[in-house]
């Protein structure tokens, strides 16, 4: 008599995060099926978001930029060794415009959903694809209003509650 046991393993699906700099959108597919379509902000002039294919290198629920005045980067998914990440922002009016310092910004709520998805499916099953020309190089703005960038980074007084903004209550 041969006994076999099976354990209920967690099935993982391939997650593809595609960022199109020309239209400032992120499309997320899971197992080849579209899951999310969100507005983003990529690098402003002089702060390019590098094109190419990547895998997440590390994830940090609460991160503050050492390079840009301790700017909050909630739900950060780092995809280059130079510190480029997908992360949340509370500058919601700037989504759809190329205004970041090279990271891919999206709303905190969407960043939290993406972070949870990548954590559940695994960084090894996740691909980050950055494509398209920058808005300024594409000769258009993708139908979005271009906003001026500032060197200040984040207006800390306008953030949501610290627990909500940085995911500490989760």
Residue ranges and their predicted role:
Residues 27-29, 57, 87:
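Beta-strand residues in well-ordered beta-sheet regions across diverse protein folds
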Residues 6-8:
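N-terminal signal peptide c-region/cleavage motif recognized by signal peptidases
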Residues 48-53, 60-170:
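Exported/periplasmic cell-wall-interacting domains
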């Amino acid at each position: 008599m041969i006994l076999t046991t099976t354990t209920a393993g967690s099935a993982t699906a391939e997650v593809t995060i595609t960022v199109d700099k020309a239209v400032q959108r992120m499309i997320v597919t899971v197992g080849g099926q579209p899951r999310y379509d969100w507005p983003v902000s990529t690098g402003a002039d002089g702060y390019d978001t590098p094109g190419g294919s990547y895998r997440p290198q590390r994830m940090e629920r609460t991160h503050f930029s050492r390079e840009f005045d301790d700017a909050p980067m909630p739900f950060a998914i780092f995809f280059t060794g130079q510190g480029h990440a997908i992360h949340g922002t509370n500058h919601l009016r700037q989504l759809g415009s190329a205004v970041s310092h090279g990271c891919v910004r999206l709303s905190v709520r969407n960043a939290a959903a993406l972070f949870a998805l990548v954590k559940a499916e695994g960084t090894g099953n996740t691909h980050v694809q950055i494509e398209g020309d920058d808005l300024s190089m594409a000769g258009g703005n993708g139908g979005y209003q271009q906003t001026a960038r500032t060197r200040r980074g984040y207006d800390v007084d306008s953030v949501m509650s610290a627990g909500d903004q940085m995911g500490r209550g989760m």
